[in-house]
Swiss-Prot record:
Listed EC numbers: 3.1.3.11
Binding site for substrate: 106-109, 196, 262
Annotated keywords: Carbohydrate metabolism, Cytoplasm, Hydrolase, Magnesium, Metal-binding
Cross-referenced SUPFAM superfamilies: Carbohydrate phosphatase (SSF56655)
The protein, known as: Fructose-1,6-bisphosphatase class 1
Gene: fbp
Assembly with partners or alone: Homotetramer.
Biological or metabolic pathway of the protein: Carbohydrate biosynthesis; gluconeogenesis
Family annotation (Gene3D superfamilies): 3.40.190.80, Fructose-1,6-Bisphosphatase, subunit A, domain 1
Molecular function via GO: fructose 1,6-bisphosphate 1-phosphatase activity; magnesium ion binding
Sequence positions that bind Mg(2+) 2: 103, 106, 268
Enzyme class, spelled out: hydrolase
Disulfide bonds: none
Species this chain originates from: Shewanella sp. (strain MR-4)
Amino acid sequence: MQTLAQHLTSKAVNESLSQLILTLADTSKAISHAVRHGALAGVLGATEQENVQGETQKKLDIITNDMLKDALKVDGTVRGLASEEEDHVVEVSANGKYLVCFDPLDGSSNIDINSLVGTIFSVLPAPAGELTETSFLQSGRNQLAAGYVLYGPSTMLALTTGQGVQLFTLHPETNEFLLTNAAMSISPDTQEFAINMSNQRFWEAPMQTYIADLLLGKIGPREKSFNMRWIAAMVGDVHRVLSRGGIFTYPTDNKDPKKPYKLRLMYEANPMALLVEQAGGKASTGYETILDIQPTQIHQRVAVILGSANEVDACLSYHGIDYSEEPTLD
């Protein structure tokens, strides 16, 4: 089996980007160790602090954020970083080539119940000039690499550098990420969907109707039965989609009219959308392709619908959009 370093060399990924990816991977090993120790190390539970989104921070949110920040500061390739747990962008190295956006511990509410969590990251080119928030406001199409590390029964890294999606598994004895799936592929059709049903009454009408039709199964207009899955961590639900197909959505809702969207564009939706597209799936807000969005702020939120291509198209048809054919540019 190829190690991660050997794989990056075989794919001719340039030296500086390879170095950055290896730094992220090495840091995830340390995060995996911290997650495994959990209560034994006294790192479970919440703090009295809130992040910029007004969410209560878990102890491990802060610990893992600091671990990634510290590692990227000494890596040498990073110009700046943006994190779910940081109010503002952080300048790292004046000579760095890359910007890194990350969610250090996605699904951290699962920590206290010993369920799935993960790290999500996105790598963008660093523009010339002074580093500001505007430096980061690039569409997802500009991503040079994206991935996540899933901390589950095995620690797994899903990675794309624009050459498909590869899956690596952390060997418990050698502590090396080894290539275990060279070409992850999302089946175009599915009978599984993932959504937080407790928000049903707050969804827009198109999503209400779409989910209602899925629940009707064989006697409904879809004429087949669907199963629902929900892990309450995007990283876990998207991993399932990449592994065996499905559709994952966190749609627009009016539960809090000031916050109609849940997931963050720069360090959740964009990297996951790139992985999904590279594996043959699709990713949309319901009204536009996620990777085509021009961001307006670092912590911008968006609706997310992603997964098996034909099922995403079916969902979008309820929104009055036909994505069954790729749009052509004049």
